[in-house]
Amino acid sequence: MSELIQQIVQVLKEQVVQDTVVPRNIRRAAEQAIEVLLDESRDPAVRAADAIAILEEISEDPNMPMHTRTIIWEVLGALEQVK
């Protein structure tokens, strides 16, 4: 697994999934994105595209705290670099 994907997974775990201020549906979506990224049976670009789709869907949630939205946007930017 690429180092970039490992870093993205770590950021999602530490700053979204484990943050109890973040609504449950957003944490669940971040967990889904992590599962997709860790599925090594698929090409890294496909995993990144699937994770982007999941995270983009929740990025506009009005209940998302602003600091979490910023983290999601940063993760989306990093995922776009995965090839």
UniProtKB/Swiss-Prot annotation:
InterPro entries: Ta0600-like_sf, UPF0147
Domain of life per record: Archaea
Chain coiled-coil ranges: none
Protein family: Belongs to the UPF0147 family.
Protein name (record): UPF0147 protein TK2131
Source organism per UniProt: Thermococcus kodakarensis (strain ATCC BAA-918 / JCM 12380 / KOD1) (Pyrococcus kodakaraensis (strain KOD1))
